[in-house]
A protein has these predicted regions:
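Structural detector of coil-to-beta-strand junctions
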Residues: 97, 144, 200, 223, ...
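Short, T/G/N/S-enriched strand-turn elements that build extracellular solenoid repeat scaffolds
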Residues: 68-74, 91-102, 117, 155, ...
Length: 524
């Protein structure tokens, strides 16, 4: 087994990943004879942006929708619609919401970018709320791309889907005055406000859905959402928000240009911390899920495995992935129908010292908690992360406690944190209910230099001192901060010390790669 090795996002030779449910081979692009229709690009973007004049008139906000949707609707099962560069070098298509078809693949060719409309009316579900933030919590925006009960469908290719989250809206209350991300940032200013922004991709029900090689960027809201699928393969994809088109290199935005500092007008520069609720990959109530050889940098959870209804989520594998800005490879917060049999293998996290950076995380609370069990993390390299390890049953304060979280049989083996200039060893959170203690095994978990702060005050209704209500099993390999855990902790904590070895930390010497080395659109 190979741990903490840098991989290209899409390999050129055939490769495979071994999962608990079998061997999953790298997907492949459709053969030329399987293309039912090629749809040429019509737009000429410059530096990742369409000229504002292209869709300043709301009546021309989505000129390519009909061509793309018609091609999908008329494509036979087992074939693909291919979006290609135009005859005069055009590389962009501009569309509103489109619906995928069961058995049909959308192929976005290399050099092609699908741009989303910035007209909220194109997405509005009939409530007239899309593109604003208010106290109404009802879903009001259709996603850019959607599908229901899809079987053997997918999105493949080396092209890009761009949600244009940093572009100024053209209709509604915020026309000419806010971008999608300005709207989203209002939820940061008031907990009572809901943003009404579209997701990039939302698939409900079905089986055997494939994402291969595609870049998803600048979503106004969550990027990739799945609910109730059996069989999802995401291989060699990239999720990037904000892209270089909406920021400066290194996210070095000037004061007064970002949503948190702008005064009286829309923001013109964005950072991961100011593009709220832009989750990367969210499989909910789904089984047989694989994400491999992929790259994610965003403003919220890199991954959020959820189980809020149905039969829960089980049989998940995350292998050979690179994470950058974001809130971690997470489970939760909805776990009430259960998450089980999940493996994270060969994970690399570089949090860039963001104040919101997280490594691996299981989160829930007593309003939406359930059993999370059989979760293994192995071969993890981390640096520049504020919270490298989070196992928190008190993710938010629960007024009505009816669904308690229970985290059992959690294993972390081969975890190496190389430290942070801003946060040293960062924070390690272990918090559970007395009736449902956290059961976690740590083996060869090592921090260079400063050790993580594990003893801390409680939060959101947790016990007053953490760690609390946790059974730790150490070994057989060294746990570098075990002594601190044993000396300072809250109530309900027990230790089983089975350390018999002093192995070298996981080798992270070649693990970290700049996102810009695999994507020219990346600012980092």
């Amino acid at each position: 087994m190979m741990f903490a090795t840098a991989f290209a996002a899409t390999t050129t030779s055939s490769s495979s990943v071994q999962t608990s449910w079998g061997t999953i081979n790298e997907p492949s692009l459709p053969v030329a004879s399987a293309v039912c229709k090629a749809v040429p690009a019509t737009q000429k973007p410059v530096n990742g942006l369409l000229d504002a004049s292209v869709d300043a008139d709301p009546t021309t906000s989505a000129p390519d929708t009909t061509a793309i949707q018609s091609a999908i609707d008329h494509c036979p099962v087992g074939e693909a619609v291919k979006l290609v560069v135009g005859s005069h070098g055009e590389s962009g298509l501009l569309t509103g919401p489109i619906t995928l078809k069961s058995g049909v693949t959308l192929w976005i060719d290399k050099g092609v970018t699908v741009f989303a409309s910035r007209n909220p009316a194109d997405y509005d579900s009939g409530l007239g709320l899309c593109g604003i933030a208010n106290t109404n919590s009802k879903d009001s925006c259709y996603p850019l791309i959607s599908g229901n009960h899809l079987v053997n469908s997918g999105i493949v290719g080396e092209g890009v889907i761009d949600g244009r989250g940093g572009s100024v809206l053209t209709t509604g209350d915020n026309a000419g005055s806010k971008t999608w991300w300005d709207v989203a940032y209002q939820t940061k200013l008031s907990s009572k406000v809901t943003q009404h922004n579209p997701r990039l991709l939302d698939v409900n029900g079905g089986s055997n859905f494939t994402l291969y090689g595609v870049t998803f960027q600048n979503s106004p809201n969550f990027h990739l959402v799945f609910d109730g699928l059996d069989g999802i393969t995401a291989w060699g994809i990239k999720i990037l928000t904000p892209s270089l088109a909406y920021t400066q290199p290194g996210y070095a935005c000037a004061e007064g240009t970002t949503p948190d500092t702008v005064n009286g007008t829309y923001a013109t520069c964005f950072t991961p911390e100011t593009v709220k609720n832009t989750d990367g990959f969210d499989p909910g109530e789904s089984s047989h899920v694989l994400m491999a050889y992929s790259y994610i940098s965003t403003g919220d959870d890199h991954v959020a495995v959820k189980a809020g209804s149905g039969s829960g989520s089980q049989h998940l594998m995350f292998a050979h992935n690179h994470l950058y800005y974001g809130h971690g490879l997470s489970i939760g917060s909805e776990t009430n129908t259960g998450v089980s049999d999940m493996t994270v293998e060969d994970l690399v996290v570089d949090g860039h010292d963001s104040s919101e950076s997280v490594g691996i995380r299981i989160k829930s609370d007593a309003t939406r908690g359930g059993l999370v069990s059989g979760v293994t993390y192995q071969g993890v390299c981390v640096r520049n992360v504020r919270q490298p390890l989070v196992f928190d049953a008190f993710y938010s304060a629960a007024k009505t406690k009816t669904k308690y979280p229970s985290f059992r049989n959690i294993t972390v083996t081969g975890f190496h944190d190389m430290g942070s200039a801003a946060y040293g060893g960062g924070e390690a959170i272990f918090a559970a209910y007395a009736k449902y203690p956290l059961q976690i095994a740590l083996n060869n978990v090592q921090f260079d230099g400063a050790q993580p702060k594990a003893s801390m005050k409680g939060h959101d209704g947790s016990p007053s001192v953490l760690p609390a209500n946790t059974t730790f099993t150490f070994g057989p390999g060294t746990v570098s901060f075990a002594q601190e855990l044993e000396q300072q902790h809250g109530g309900g904590v027990t230790f089983v010390d089975s350390v018999t070895q002093s192995p070298a930390p996981v080798d992270c010497s070649n693990a970290f790669v700049k996102y810009s080395s695999v994507s020219a659109n990346s600012p980092i």
